[in-house]
């Protein structure tokens, strides 16, 4: 506790930087070894989906790591510190998301054999809708990745003096390098290693913190006495930052927009060998998410007990709540060289996993949605080179954009969920319209996307300009009375630097800011977890209404496989290229078996239209299922099998 009382600024030592450097080297080595095995990537399909040969375990852990970035490593403990253990309800929202993704969205994407999620929007609506989805995704991912890269570097710099540009460049360059060289397989297997590092960092902090404060019983007693064990918060007020309802309603839809239809996640589970493996990957992902979130939340409770009546934010030792966790690590491990470096590796493992995922996914949608439709005759090797080049470009762009995230207020966790909610929420609505409402048409979905984006962006900007008060968000009280008293007893005088300038336990001011608009304490004050739900609901309602007014689409005009309602119960298996020869006799055949009006010259493979035609023929013939397809339009490799 000496460091707590003296107020000295702790720093990382040589051993800590050594552990951090080791994590970077191991990540690079894994990425290069896995990515270059078996001669590297022979096609863009290999680069973006690993040849669709990946097993459930690594894919599941990669899914859990992709959005468990340094933002969560630093943000979740600080939120649990300030709002209590009710943050564990986030795990329920994630569970509902995993179930809905496995039952509703994953089967459609998997059986269509898509590489780009937004290809579905063109198949269901039009190319204009596909381009809107692609551009929205790239913007959202660039902003989110900027937060993930910049925010932890800034926080650690403010707390420990860690050089901000050294940390940015080291993680950014290494991540971009192994992603560009190794592709999807490199990203997945480095994610597996980084999940292990993240969990190890949390568990070491938990064990040491619990030991220092007197054991688990002491932690539970003090947390209960200070209202931190508050799982039974069912307040329906949408302005309360965290309640059961914000996590179950708002949280579920935010996570659904990130897992159900987000390119980064869809790209992973469609890379699994079979649909059953993809569902198993989502289950493993849920276990990983639960372990990470629960460990982070428990760290926040232990951190509160450690700093009981000695809040470092009130004492001025830190300047923002996101800095609690790195300060705690340095305080409790000050006499154990190298251990704080494990937490540093933990935080940046999250950064590497998220950034590599984002870079690979942005390159994938650029190739599939913007390049291939224009340059259909490109050879596979050229597409691989272009894909690697795009990975380098997007990695450099993410480093450049990272500084913009410093403009976001409210904490790194809120900033990341705000970006994903505002932009991905309306996109989720577009996919819901496509898969579940046959009557929805192109004008309807475009109008819905515009309305959903406008409304969610409006409330997010309003909340940024006029943030709600701590009383409105229901921040729990904390105090620095014990440390102030210790300072008085030691010197006989009260050091002005130790005066709690913003003691959260004091009564709120009764004055009202006349410059705040009327919406500031109502509409703008709703929990940031509802931004995505607001965008999704607006998109669905507006899209359905406009579709009815402009002439609904007839269900008979839609190709089979585009609606969830038409899915058969059987699951799909997407075979690797070398196994195509041993598939059963029900494969969709080559161009020589096409009907007369659809025959192609020798050497040409079925196009997207042929694929949908044969899917319809399968259903008419009573096959009871329809056929998945792997590849892309016009001359791409086809790999198809019964479901």
From Swiss-Prot:
Activity: how regulated: Dysidenin and perchlorate inhibit iodide transport activity. Oxyanions inhibit iodide transport activity by blocking the binding sites for iodide and one of the sodium ions.
Short name of one Pfam family: SSF
PROSITE patterns named among the record's database cross-references: NA_SOLUT_SYMP_1, NA_SOLUT_SYMP_3
Domain of life: Eukaryota
Outcome when changing residue 243 to A: Loss of localization to the cell membrane, significant loss of iodide transport activity but no effect on homodimerization. Reduced homodimerization
UniProt-annotated glycosylation sites, renumbered to this chain: 489, 502
Phylogenetic lineage: Eukaryota, Metazoa, Chordata, Craniata, Vertebrata
Job of this protein: Sodium:iodide symporter that mediates the transport of iodide into the thyroid gland. Can also mediate the transport of chlorate, thiocynate, nitrate and selenocynate.
Skewed-composition ranges (Basic and acidic residues): 633-643
Residues recorded with modification Phosphoserine: 556
The protein's name: Sodium/iodide cotransporter
Known tissue expression: Expression is primarily in thyroid tissue, but also to a lower extent in mammary gland and ovary. Expression is reduced in tumors.
PANTHER family linked: SODIUM-COUPLED MONOCARBOXYLATE TRANSPORTER (PTHR42985), SODIUM_IODIDE COTRANSPORTER (PTHR42985:SF11)
Membrane topology: Multi-pass membrane protein
Recorded disease: Thyroid dyshormonogenesis 1: A disorder characterized by the inability of the thyroid to maintain a concentration difference of readily exchangeable iodine between the plasma and the thyroid gland, leading to congenital hypothyroidism.
Segments of this protein annotated with the region Disordered: 623-643
Residues in the Extracellular compartment per record: 1-14, 81-84, 158-163, 209-243, 302-335, 409-411, 466-525
Catalysed reactions, semicolon-separated: iodide(out) + 2 Na(+)(out) = iodide(in) + 2 Na(+)(in); chlorate(out) + 2 Na(+)(out) = chlorate(in) + 2 Na(+)(in); thiocyanate(out) + 2 Na(+)(out) = thiocyanate(in) + 2 Na(+)(in); nitrate(out) + 2 Na(+)(out) = nitrate(in) + 2 Na(+)(in)
Assigned GO CC terms: cytoplasm; extracellular exosome; extracellular vesicle; membrane; nucleus; plasma membrane
């Amino acid at each position: 506790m000496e460091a707590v009382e003296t107020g000295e600024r702790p720093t990382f030592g040589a051993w800590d930087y050594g552990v951090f450097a080791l994590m970077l080297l191991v990540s690079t080595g894994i990425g290069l070894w896995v990515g270059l095995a078996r001669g590297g990537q022979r096609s863009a399909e290999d680069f973006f989906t690993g040849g669709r040969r990946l097993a459930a375990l690594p894919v599941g852990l990669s899914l859990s790591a992709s959005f468990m970035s340094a933002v969560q490593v630093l943000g979740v403990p600080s939120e649990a510190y300030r709002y209590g253990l009710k943050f564990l309800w986030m795990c329920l929202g994630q569970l509902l998301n995993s179930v809905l993704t496995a039952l509703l969205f994953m089967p459609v994407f998997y059986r269509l054999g898509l590489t780009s999620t937004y290809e579905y929007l063109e198949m269901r609506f039009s190319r204009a809708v596909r381009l809107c989805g692609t551009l929205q995704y790239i913007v959202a991912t660039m902003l989110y990745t900027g937060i993930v890269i910049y925010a932890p570097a800034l926080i650690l710099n403010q707390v420990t003096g860690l050089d901000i540009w050294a940390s940015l460049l080291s993680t950014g360059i290494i991540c971009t390098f192994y992603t560009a060289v190794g592709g999807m397989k490199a990203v997945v297997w480095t994610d597996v290693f980084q999940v292990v590092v993240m969990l190890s960092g949390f568990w070491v902090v938990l064990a040491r913190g619990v030991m220092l404060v007197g054991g688990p019983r002491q932690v539970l007693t003090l947390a209960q006495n200070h209202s931190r064990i508050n799982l039974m918060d069912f307040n329906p007020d949408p302005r309360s930052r965290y309640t059961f309802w914000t996590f179950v309603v708002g949280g579920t839809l935010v996570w659904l927009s990130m897992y159900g239809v987000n390119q980064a996640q869809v790209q992973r589970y469609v890379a699994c060998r079979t649909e059953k493996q993809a569902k198993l990957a989502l289950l493993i992902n849920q276990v990983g998410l639960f372990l990470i979130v629960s460990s982070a939340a428990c760290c926040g409770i232990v951190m509160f007990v450690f700093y009981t009546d000695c809040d470092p934010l009130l004492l001025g030792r830190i300047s923002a709540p996101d800095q609690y966790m790195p300060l705690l690590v340095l305080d409790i491990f000050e006499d154990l060289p190298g251990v704080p470096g494990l937490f540093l590796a933990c935080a940046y493992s999250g950064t590497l996993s998220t950034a590599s995922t984002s870079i690979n996914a942005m390159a994938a949608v650029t190739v599939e949605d913007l390049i291939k439709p224009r340059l259909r005759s490109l050879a596979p090797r050229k597409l691989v080179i272009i894909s690697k080049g795009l990975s380098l470009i997007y990695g450099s762009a993410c480093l450049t954009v990272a500084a913009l995230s410093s403009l976001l207020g409210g904490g790194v966790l809120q900033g990341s969920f705000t970006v994903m909610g505002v932009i991905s929420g309306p996109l989720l609505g577009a996919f819901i319209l496509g898969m579940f409402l046959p009557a929805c048409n192109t004008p309807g979905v475009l109008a819905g996307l515009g309305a959903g984006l406008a409304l969610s962006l409006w409330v997010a900007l309003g909340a940024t300009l006029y943030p709600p008060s701590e009383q409105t968000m229901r921040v729990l009280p904390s105090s620095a009375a014990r440390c102030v008293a210790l300072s008085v007893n030691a010197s006989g005088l009260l050091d002005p630097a130790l005066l709690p300038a913003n003691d959260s336990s004091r009564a709120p001011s009764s004055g009202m800011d006349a410059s705040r608009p009327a919406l500031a304490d109502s509409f703008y004050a709703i929990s940031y977890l509802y931004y995505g739900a607001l965008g999704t609901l607006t998109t669905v309602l507006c899209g359905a209404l406009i579709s009815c007014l402009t002439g609904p689409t007839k269900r008979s005009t839609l190709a089979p496989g585009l609606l969830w309602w038409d899915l058969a119960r059987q699951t799909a298996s997407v075979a690797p290229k070398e196994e195509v020869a041993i598939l059963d006799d029900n494969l969709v055949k080559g161009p020589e078996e096409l009907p007369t009006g659809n025959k192609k010259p020798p050497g040409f493979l079925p196009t997207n239209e042929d694929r949908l035609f044969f899917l319809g023929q399968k259903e008419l013939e009573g096959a009871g299922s329809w056929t998945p397809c792997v590849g892309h339009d016009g001359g791409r490799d086809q790999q198809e099998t019964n479901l």
